[in-house]
Curated annotation (Swiss-Prot):
Organism: Aspergillus terreus (strain NIH 2624 / FGSC A1156)
Region (Disordered): 240-259, 299-387, 576-596, 750-785
Protein name: Lysophospholipase nte1
Chemical reaction(s) catalysed: a 1-acyl-sn-glycero-3-phosphocholine + H2O = sn-glycerol 3-phosphocholine + a fatty acid + H(+)
Start-end of Low complexity biased regions: 761-771
Subcellular localization(s) per the UniProt record: Endoplasmic reticulum membrane
Keyword Magnesium: no
Side of membrane Lumenal, spans: 91-112
Sequence motif GXGXXG, residues: 1228-1233
Motif (DGA/G): 1375-1377
Taxonomic path: Eukaryota, Fungi, Dikarya, Ascomycota, Pezizomycotina
Chain positions recorded as a nucleoside 3',5'-cyclic phosphate 2 binding sites: 846-966
Recorded name of the encoding gene: nte1
Record-linked Pfam families: cNMP_binding, NTE_Ploop, Patatin
Length: 1527
């Protein structure tokens, strides 16, 4: 085998070998592998078979049938078949395959071609690669998965199961009765049984009449229909005779004297099942029959005498206390029965005679003024004068007699006070607010307050005038000269050294109350012969110090000897009674020697004298106390505990409890089980003077000086407290423009404030409430157009009705002169009413005695209606029979289309009205109205309007203004607009975010930190300043106030009253669902919400959580918004779409919030880290520290970071909920839009937050850049990069195409926008964003707030002819500027309060043309190039087409400039063209400079919406500041 002589000798030798041996075949194969192809061919010829032939692997023998055969077969398979297979595989890999490869690579090919062929081949390759890059790599934007715009959810009206009488028999009877007595509020079991145990039922047949003036009790309809008629007073008198005289003229005729047969009756209202036939005022009359209008013993001492009239009293008169009582003071002494009070031009017989003689217990009446009794005067004992009821069908009525109310007042005084407080609240919400704000009956309403002064005027003692008052004034004069005008205008308070005593904790007060309650069980109470000498030292000290103590001790020699014999004679008749903290000063014994040093202080003497006068004005004397004290021990735990809601509020001026000072929610539900807190307070409550109230309130009185022109109380705000006038005059008036213009719900809040005084919201920064400083120009303008109503003289009290009943002020109160007042904050009044409900009963008595006849009839006809969540009030097409005023809750008006779709027309919150247009025009209902949640309504029937229109035509003028305003709104915003189809959604209308009162925070699933989220949102709402404040509720807060029975069936009504109280008290209430999904509190949070915030963790799974399933099961129609919490300020593309994909019920939008949170708690024993991990972290820390000093990059926080004050995410959400969002609208204009980047930077530096962004064309591009990161730094970089691409002409040149549709293909334009935004979606933007386009397929504008950003920004930037339209769901979209280049109206519809609109559009040449009736194109061309021609150049064809395209846009632009709340900005960018993108820096600086100058101008004018001007600081200017600027 080593022979190399040639192949033949070797081959011949191989012929002698056996060809069947595998060794020779292997050798021949080995030789073939190393020989040439010729040798292989020769070998093939000798062997007679091809060289590639290999023997196939042998087949295994057939399987035997015996056991031995099986063993032989296996042996043969292992030692024969397997080696053959291995041999075949090795041979193929080592011989056959290399042979094939060698043969292939040994071949040679020759191609011959010319240069043209090579060029074509190269061109083909380049084209193929270009096509691949262009349409497969650079065209990625066209292959994104389809993400169409999110369809807004259709509104579903759930079946109305509330209609009709579904419960027959006894169940229906009970339901109607219970619904009728809901007017009393929550009634505990003993109180309910006491009221109903003497109830009587009466059957009326159809047509039977009932004289309600003969029915002395509370009447209600159980089953049937009753019409209420009133006797007409149209007897030839002019309407002016029936107006209330605010000038104080008491010479009026008695009502009802001219009754003759010509007078008929007019229909007031129709009373159906479950409604009351009695008015609120008549109910108050039933409760207050035994209450005095004015206390008599208030004049029983010279210290509390009636001021100047005492100068006419002889010296001998004080020897008898009774002589001083009946001193002739006809001006101060009111009518005994109240019949001679001027009420609407006539005397009002509305209440039964007040037997004050019996209550006073004085037999001698010869000292009464002559005006007490009028000869021939007819005294009516009815609380329903001139009211007749007629049954339309067979009717069953129930009557609770007056005796039941009298007994209830005696047995349960605190429960009575609670009922009176509820009725007073509803009286203000229903009757007074409707008469004042809706019907324009301001004179009638304010006349009650004016005439209330004759009950509340008590002069200071004579000793407090003269030299003492001069010394007091000197202190203020010195301080006034030291302070500036601005500080003095806020008021100067006299320093109170004892003010620190007020700040004792409530727990200490409760302990003290409980201790004194145990000490009060001494045998002193039943003694009848007690005297001052028998009092212990502790009792003397507890009795408190009064001005009388000063006079009876060391001051006697100073003021004269006449007081030495006065004190014992006055004290002796009352010696047998228990000593009262409100006893007149001279009725007390000698004071404790420990108080003598303090009695020298004249300031303390002033304070105590003022407190005495205020208490007498409130009706707090020993005699009035004894009226309710008879059965105080019987009014045990069954009566509600009279506690204020928040005992920590020392800032009385900020409390606005709707139920005033009586909180009926501290007691238990069933009256049998009590919580420990309630029990501890029970001992301090009631009418027993356990804690010395005088001692507590003495330090709360503040003496304040207001210079002339200062504002003490503003119209629409809650009274901060009582102002007692020491010296000077207070002018009570109202803005002249408000008379007749303050319409309830006259327009959407975009046109002004809500009209009900219960909701005074700041609509814009330039509104009336934006500046409270009296020295401001706004205040001066208000004073000039102000109408003065009446003056409050020294000794009078301002704010009595508003403070005690917790009403809002209908008037402004200014200082007519330099005025010195004593101020008692409302928190102190709460403590008074806690222990002495007589204060509320006295107020109720006085109100009923002063009620005008007109208001009585309105009160009779107005019906208080309570509807459940989801209940339909009326359907589309129903007959219009009443106007509805929203007292509490929220309504939604829905328009049902012919195709079954429902579009939201509007939403109505607290204080708004609905339905007046169709009622006055007697047309059918244009839409369906349903309650979003549990709602209280005031039903104003059409019959009442007809009755008022006949007797008081002035009311028709007022309502006519309302109808005209509503018609104007319909013209500007038609009800059938298609906004639900192509706008921002079916729920996101202009009214959906306005007037939200309750917001629920609901987690998507368990584990979401809703409590921390709620606290942060609450802090943000406090900082931006919500009108009337904001509070939050969780289950713990509810249980603390209502006890463990808060969520039982018995406690449901109590809970609803408590929540309604909070809604009236605060501008917004947050409900935090911090319990499990099936808890009653979670259900309460859902049913009470105007808006529900579904909070979820963005990084968690977007599946539907258990709370959402529970929410869907509740079938609520409230507005629902999604809040996604992010750990970092970044949202990955497509994340929001995954959350919204399956949540079709999210109808209010979504919000991205950055909030640091921890999903899992830290382990108590942290795990030890590995050495490598620790070393890596340490190196990273060191590296970061080194880069701080070596890196050239400037490290700074973004301008729009979450930590920036007033610009964080929670503040943005808070402004959204309050309807105070700041919108930014960017117009289109090509390269001129670069100036918008500079304007946005100027807004950032000015500290103005931006919440919503909308744009058109280049404005859509810039707005999307800013909305993506909410930061101007990345926006600047991306905008400059895009401008560089747009400035390159080569890109457009390479994108040119045959101009059938456009000059370019649009690819380069698409590519530039896609490189900027990528696959981001509008839902992922950090700020809310939209852009508008023009749909030329359907000839309408469209607004896009979801989908891929690049597509709709590209569509909004599409210029016709230059770029082809973009296709979207079959429609072609073009530049939105063709229809509306500045979308301010749409931004306003999204709820933005202040809108910055930046217009960068081109200005067309408006030069007058005069080329004649015909035009030669040759002449026009020559004239264009002729420098000496004076004829203006005619527009070209392209210019004419462009102007034609923008015709509608110009009209919308002019409308946008005049939109309320819009701040129009136009930088000086006219010299720049549409395609001047190469001048980026120059145009940017122009916009930045203009923005700085414009905002500085707004700041100097005071119209810039600065973050410092919040409601809380406005209140501080007038309330807390005077306390600080003290002497």
């Amino acid at each position: 085998m080593a022979d190399d002589g040639g192949p033949f000798p070797l081959s011949s030798s191989l012929l002698h070998a056996s060809s069947s041996t595998t060794i020779l075949e292997s050798s021949s194969s080995s030789l073939l592998a190393t020989s040439s192809p010729a040798i292989a061919a020769t070998f093939s010829s000798f062997s007679g078979r091809p060289s590639s032939y290999l023997p196939p692997p042998p087949l295994p023998p057939p399987a035997p049938s015996t056991m031995v055969g099986w063993i032989g077969w296996v042996f043969s398979f292992v030692f024969q078949v397997i080696p053959s297979i291995l041999y075949w595989a090795i041979t193929f890999c080592t011989i056959t395959l290399p042979t094939w490869l060698f043969t292939l690579f040994s071949m040679s090919l020759t191609f011959t071609m010319n240069f043209t062929t090579l060029l074509l081949i190269a061109l083909a390759i380049v084209s193929t690669v270009s096509w691949f890059i262009r349409y497969r790599f650079l065209n990625m934007y066209s292959r994104l998965p389809p993400e169409p715009q999110r369809k807004e959810p259709q509104l579903d009206l759930f079946p109305d199961v509330q209609e009709g009488d579904s419960k027959p028999g006894l169940a229906n009877y009970l339901d109607e009765f219970l619904s009728a007595i809901k007017v009393f509020g929550y009634l505990e079991r003993p109180v309910f049984h006491e009221l109903t145990r003497t109830m009587q039922t009466r059957k009326l047949i159809a047509g039977e009449t009932l004289l309600l003036e003969e029915e002395k009790g509370f009447c209600l309809v159980v089953d049937g229909l009753v019409q209420i008629f009133v006797k007409s007073i149209r007897d030839g008198k002019s309407p002016a005779d029936h107006e209330l005289n605010l000038a104080g003229d008491d010479s009026t005729d008695e009502e009802g004297q001219n009754v003759d047969g010509r007078q008929g009756y007019q229909l007031l209202t129709e009373v159906k099942n479950g409604a009351s036939m009695s008015s609120l005022f008549s109910i108050l009359s039933l409760f207050t029959e035994d209450i005095q209008l004015r206390t008599s013993e208030s004049l029983s001492s010279s210290v509390s005498s009636v001021g100047p009239n005492l100068a006419r009293v002889p010296d001998s008169s004080p020897s008898s206390p009774r002589g001083l009582v009946h001193s002739p003071v006809p001006v101060r002494e009111p009518s005994e029965s109240g019949h001679n009070l001027p009420t609407n031009g006539e005397f009002l017989p509305t209440v039964p005679p007040l037997h004050l003689e019996e209550s006073r217990g004085t037999p001698d009446h010869d000292h009464q003024p002559e005006s007490r009794t009028r000869p021939g005067k007819k005294r009516r004992k009815s609380v329903h004068p001139d009211i007749v009821a007629r049954a339309m069908v067979d009717t069953t009525i129930a009557i609770i007699p007056a005796s039941a109310f009298r007994r209830l007042t005696r047995v349960y005084p605190r429960a009575t006070a609670h009922i009176v407080q509820v009725i007073l609240t509803r009286l203000q919400r229903v009757t007074f607010a409707t008469a004042h704000s809706y019907l324009g009956l301001t004179n009638e309403v304010l006349g009650i307050e004016k005439q209330m002064t004759k009950f509340t005027t008590y002069d200071l003692p004579n000793d407090m005038r003269g030299a003492a008052l001069d010394r007091l004034k000197d202190k203020f004069i010195k301080e006034r000269d030291r302070l500036g005008h601005e500080e003095v205008t806020k008021g100067i308070a006299l320093h109170n050294p004892s003010a620190g005593r007020r700040r004792r904790s409530s727990s200490f007060l409760r302990k003290e109350a409980a201790l004194q309650a145990r000490m009060a069980t001494t045998p002193r109470r039943p003694t009848a012969t007690g005297s001052q000498e028998n009092m212990s030292f502790h009792d003397r000290d507890a009795a408190g110090v009064s001005p009388g103590d000063l006079l009876s001790t060391i001051q006697l020699s100073r003021f004269g000897p006449r007081y030495e014999h006065l004190a014992p004679k006055i004290y002796s008749p009352l010696a047998e009674k228990e000593q009262s903290p409100f006893r007149p000063p001279t009725m007390r014994g000698p004071a404790s020697p420990f108080h003598r040093k303090e009695s020298l202080d004249e300031d303390a003497l002033f304070r105590e004298s003022i407190l005495d006068c205020i208490m007498k004005a409130l009706g707090l004397t020993s005699s009035t106390r004894d009226i309710l004290r008879k059965s105080s021990h019987n009014s045990g735990d069954a009566s509600p505990k009279l506690l204020s809601y928040d005992s920590r509020r020392q800032k009385a001026v900020f409390s606005n409890n709707a139920f005033g000072f009586i909180d009926p929610y501290e007691g238990s539900v069933d009256g049998e089980t009590e919580s420990m807190m309630s029990m501890s307070v029970t001992s301090a409550g009631g009418t027993s003077p356990i804690v010395n109230l005088r001692e507590e309130l003495r330090n709360d009185i503040e003496i304040v000086y207001f210079p002339q022109g200062s504002v003490l109380v503003e119209q629409g705000e809650r009274h901060p407290g009582l102002y007692y006038v020491i010296d000077g005059f207070l002018d009570v008036g109202m803005p002249a423009c408000d008379k007749g213009d303050d319409l309830v719900g006259a327009t959407r809040p975009a046109h002004g404030e809500e009209a009900f005084p219960t909701l005074k919201r700041t609509t814009t920064a330039s509104s009336r409430t934006s500046s409270v400083a009296p020295g401001g120009s706004d205040s001066k303008r208000r004073r000039q157009s102000r109408k003065s109503l009446y003056l409050i003289k020294p000794g009078g009290i301002q704010g009595y009705v508003g403070s005690v009943a917790s009403y809002r002020s209908y008037t402004d109160v200014l200082a007519k002169t330099d005025v010195y007042v004593g101020f008692l904050p409302r928190a102190s009044l709460e403590r008074i009413a806690e222990r002495y409900p007589i204060a509320l009963l006295t107020l109720a008595k006085r109100l009923t005695s002063l009620l005008p006849r007109l208001l009585l009839h309105i009160d009779f006809a107005l019906e208080w209606v309570q509807v459940n969540a989801g209940q339909v009030i009326y359907h589309q097409g129903d007959e219009s029979d009443a106007i509805y005023l929203v007292l509490n809750g929220r309504l939604r008006s829905v328009l049902e289309g012919t195709d079954g779709k429902m579009n939201v027309v509007g939403e109505y919150g607290q204080g708004e009205s609905v339905g007046e247009l169709e009622v006055m025009t007697e047309s059918t209902r244009p839409a369906t109205l349903h309650a979003i949640r549990d709602t209280e309504l005031a039903k104003f029937p059409r019959s009442l309007f007809n009755s008022l229109a006949q007797e008081h035509p002035g009311i028709t003028i007022q309502v006519s203004k309302l109808i005209a305003q509503r018609m104007r709104d319909l013209v500007e915003r038609p009800m059938t607009e298609k906004g639900a189809e192509h706008g921002a959604g079916s729920i996101k209308t202009a009214t959906s975010t306005v007037n939200l009162r309750t917001v629920s925070i609901l987690p998507v699933t368990a584990g979401v930190p809703v409590v921390e989220f709620g606290h942060r949102l609450l802090n943000a709402l406090h900082q931006i300043g919500v009108t009337n404040g904001v509070t939050s509720l969780n289950q713990a807060a509810i249980l603390n106030h209502l006890g463990r029975h808060a969520f039982t069936k018995m406690g449901k009504l109590k809970l609803s009253q408590y929540l309604a109280d909070l809604e009236e008290k605060y501008g917004m209430v947050l409900y935090i669902a911090d319990t499990n999904v099936n808890s009653p509190w979670t259900q309460t949070c859902i049913t009470q919400a105007d808006c529900i915030l579904l909070v979820g963790l963005a990084e968690s799974t977007p599946s539907i959580g258990e709370y959402e399933r529970f929410l869907l099961g509740m079938k609520t129609t409230s507005r629902k918004e999604l809040v996604l919490l992010h750990a970092d300020r970044y949202c990955p593309p497509g994340l929001t779409r995954r959350w919204l994909k399956n949540r079709v019920w999210i109808n209010g939008g979504h919000h991205h919030i950055q909030m640091g949170f921890r999903l899992t708690a830290e382990p108590s024993h942290p795990q030890t880290k590995r050495f490598g991990t620790v070393l890596k972290e340490r190196v990273q820390v060191i590296q970061a520290e080194i880069q701080k000093y070596t890196s050239r990059r400037i490290h700074q926080t973004a301008l729009y970071s979450a930590q920036t004050p007033f610009k964080g995410d929670f503040h943005r959400l808070a402004r959204r909920l309050c309807g105070r969002s700041v919108g930014l609208v960017l117009g289109g204009g090509g390269a001129r839009g670069i100036a918008q980047v500079g304007v946005i930077k100027a807004l950032e530096e000015a500290g103005i937050p931006i919440d919503i962004i909308g744009g058109t064309s280049i404005g859509a591009f810039n707005g999307a850049l800013y909305a993506r990161d909410a930061d101007v730094v990345p926006m600047y970089g991306r905008a400059k990069k895009f401008a560089g691409r747009m400035g390159s002409m080569w890109r457009f040149a390479l994108d040119l195409t045959y101009p059938t549709v456009s000059y370019t293909t649009g690819h380069e334009f698409n590519r530039g926008i896609f490189k900027t935004f990528g696959d981001s979606q509008i839902e992922d933007f950090w700020l809310e964003f939209y852009c508008n386009t023009t749909n030329i397929s359907k000839s309408r504008p469209e607004y896009h707030s979801s989908g891929y950003v690049w597509r709709y920004v590209r569509a909004s930037m599409t210029l016709a002819g230059l770029i082809p339209p973009i296709c979207d769901e079959g429609s072609m979209l073009l530049d939105g500027g063709y229809i509306d280049n500045l979308t301010v109206p749409h931004m306003k519809g999204l709820g933005a309060d202040v809108i910055f609109a930046v217009d960068v559009g081109s200005i067309d040449d408006n030069t007058p043309q005069g080329y004649g009736d015909s035009l030669s194109g040759f002449w026009a061309t020559i004239n264009r190039w002729n420098p000496f021609s004076s004829v203006p150049n005619p527009p070209t064809l392209s210019e004419i087409q462009a102007r034609l395209a923008y015709v509608s846009s110009f009209e919308n632009l002019e409308q946008a400039k005049t939109t309320p709340g819009c701040l129009y900005m136009r930088p000086p960018i006219d010299p720049y063209g549409t395609l001047d993108f190469g001048k980026f820096d120059e145009i940017y600086q122009v916009g930045y400079k203009y923005g700085k100058e414009y905002l500085e101008k707004l700041k100097n004018e005071g119209t810039l919406p600065l973050r410092e001007e919040t409601e809380e600081k406005k209140k501080l200017q007038r309330t807390l500041a005077p306390r600080r600027a003290s002497i």
